[in-house]
Amino acid sequence: MPILISPSDNTGWGLGKLRIRATGLTFTDSTPVSVRHYFRDSGGQRNGRATRAHLRRNLKKYRRKHDRRTHTRRVQPDVILIKAGRRTARSARRRSARKSRSEKTGPRIRYTRRI
């Protein structure tokens, strides 16, 4: 577990895990690491892991809970086509409205904008 020591200008440089205490002690899994006012075991990161059986049980619960959402009614193909047709007609109306707006301005304004 290397640490970072920061001088006054905050550039910082690292020390390896062998020199943390400046005593030459090497840390093992059984050696606690000093963290401010308390000691934390260096193997603490391996605590709280779930077993495979526990994971399988929770996965089954999750599937049971969320499986109902996947069974939705199928949409008929003609409904999809009707919606697509409406969308196309709406975009065509919008496009034609945009064209008619630009034609109202007249040819001279249209060309002066391009220059």
From Swiss-Prot:
Disordered: annotated segments: 85-115
What are the GO cellular component annotations? host cell; host cell nucleolus; viral capsid
Gene, per the UniProt record:
L2
Functional note: Plays a role in the inhibition of host immune response within the nucleus. Interacts with cellular nucleosomes and immobilizes the host immune danger signal HMGB1 on chromatin. In turn, prevents HMGB1 release out of the cell and thus decreases inflammation. Also plays a role in the wrapping and condensation of the viral DNA. May also promote viral genome import into the nucleus.
On modification after translation, the UniProt record reads:
Cleaved near the N-terminus by the viral protease during virion maturation to form the mature protein.
The alphabetized list of GO BP terms reads:
symbiont entry into host cell; viral penetration into host nucleus
Keywords, A to Z, come to:
DNA-binding, Host nucleus, Host-virus interaction, Late protein, Phosphoprotein, Viral penetration into host nucleus, Virion, Virus entry into host cell
Q: Which family does it belong to?
A: Belongs to the adenoviridae histone-like nucleoprotein family.
Which organism is this entry from?
Answer: Snake adenovirus serotype 1
Q: Mind telling me what this protein is named?
A: Pre-histone-like nucleoprotein
- Induction (record text): Expressed in the late phase of the viral replicative cycle.
Keyword Cell membrane attached:
no
Coiled coil: which residue ranges? none
Q: Name one Pfam family in it.
A: Adeno_VII
Q: Does the keyword Lipoprotein apply?
A: no
Report biased composition (Basic residues) as residue ranges.
Answer: 85-99
Any one GO molecular function term: DNA binding
Q: Where is this motif: Nuclear localization signal?
A: 114-115
The entry's other comment says: All late proteins expressed from the major late promoter are produced by alternative splicing and alternative polyadenylation of the same gene giving rise to non-overlapping ORFs. A leader sequence is present in the N-terminus of all these mRNAs and is recognized by the viral shutoff protein to provide expression although conventional translation via ribosome scanning from the cap has been shut off in the host cell.
Show the propeptide residue ranges: 2-23
